[in-house]
Amino acid sequence: MQAALVILDGWGLGDHDRRDAVRAADTPTFDEYAERGAFGTLTTSGRDVGLPDGQMGNSEVGHLTIGAGRVVKQAYTRIEDAIAAGDLCGNDAISGALDHVADTGGTLHVMGLVSDGGVHADQQHIHALVECAAGRGVEAAVHAFTDGRDTSPTGGEDYLADLEAVADEHGTGDVASVSGRYYAMDRDQNWARTKRAYDAITRSDGVAHHAAAAVDAVTDSYERGDTDEFVEPTTIEGGAALSDGDAVVFANFRADRARQLTRLLADIHPADWDADGIETNPPAVPVVTMTEYDETFDCPVAFPAAEPTDTLGAVLAAHDHTQLRVAESEKYAHVTYFLNGGREVAFDGETRTIVDSPDVPTYDEQPAMSAPAVTDTVLDALAGDDPDVLVLNYANPDMVGHTGDFDAAIEAVEAVDRELGRLVPALNDAGAHAFLTADHGNADDLGTPADPHTAHTFNPVPFVSLPPASGDTAAVRDGGALRDIAPTLLDVLGIDRPTVMTGASLLE
């Protein structure tokens, strides 16, 4: 092996005392490597990753930027620009949905994550779509998914109040159902969860909860002990069910957590689809997705991806380098699809290994997750085919950080530190130049006990260069960003970076 990129997902470097699990954890291995190797920090948010100013980074954007080696203008920014220019309602896919319901007399069903977290969606985009419906003179209904993960665990009450105010202002856009993202945005094939959100949208039999108003849905949930992420799917009095003649616009711009619900609503069932016996019979309506959720979906896409060319994976393949991508299922798409610039198919010489994430409701119940098995996969590969380049993701600091459980987050960080002690020596012994970094922070700020912080952070992330024993320890320059990682790997491999990669090697 020649080079290895080890992504410590959610491992940020804070400078405060707000329950920083990274600082509080006992991390002798990472500390030793940071001291022994060349150490620097990278920025991961805002314009440095193609997002609006002041917007925290996320795993999708982070891995996309890492693989592209340049700043890629994200869908979030493109949607914001369209709204600012007054072009959203005239977007071909969105205007097509509006035309459809204008012709049929049906309802435009807008659905998505209602928060200002900006990781999967932004509530302002949902507000703007309601305004589009009002401007066209058609009825709209909103199916609101509450956040509590990229935002405050109890911020949903305010977000839904804002949404209800938008509906009042425009005379349409009443909330028809409310579901926590735990149900509506599952990405781990927990189809029974997704089906519950589907049932609330279609008003199928078996919806357990009903509320007089959207805000009541979350306040009732709080009384049951469930915060925004876990609001059980609830129908709202007087809300419209998805029916024949209607149309759907799914406002989430991030794909991974929108795919399962889209499959159920658009009746997309490939031959090898396994949904644990879940059966649905949705009305045959157009389902517009804000971005391309899956290249196999036959859905109109409002903002198709502008896929970057000459990504890290493409360049490695062009130079006949074999590459191994390893992650547990929670982050598998990130080290494959997103790192490859939105490409579903592996490059020549690219091997992908997925390790199942633990089957637990939330990862504070098992902070180590599947990190040991991820490491074992690489050790087995080193003893076998020994690929030229490795990209690996340890999910723990991010996934456990999202629970807001400080003690569990400490355990998660320490679990990753233990794995680094097994992994890095083996990589160096195999001749690999290892790099440790992160895509964004999370476990570095868990807020306070009274006000847990479960979202990503704006803090910089580490970049540690660990050459093999025979290699030189070049210094890591200041001013680095995620776009500089791919050029750095190409540098140690002796490959010229493509001109489209505007990042530069971090090694001085």
Curated annotation (Swiss-Prot):
SUPFAM superfamilies: 2,3-Bisphosphoglycerate-independent phosphoglycerate mutase, substrate-binding domain, Alkaline phosphatase-like. Pfam families: iPGM_N, Metalloenzyme. Binds 2 manganese ions per subunit. Mn(2+) 1 binds at D398, H402, H456. Mn(2+) 2 binds at D9, S59, D439, H440. It is an enzyme of class 5 (isomerase). It catalyses: (2R)-2-phosphoglycerate = (2R)-3-phosphoglycerate. The active site is at S59. Its EC number is 5.4.2.12. Pathway: Carbohydrate degradation; glycolysis; pyruvate from D-glyceraldehyde 3-phosphate: step 3/5. Gene3D superfamilies: Alkaline Phosphatase, subunit A (3.40.720.10), BPG-independent phosphoglycerate mutase, domain B (3.40.1450.10). Catalyzes the interconversion of 2-phosphoglycerate and 3-phosphoglycerate. This is 2,3-bisphosphoglycerate-independent phosphoglycerate mutase. It comes from Halobacterium salinarum (strain ATCC 700922 / JCM 11081 / NRC-1) (Halobacterium halobium). The gene is gpmI.
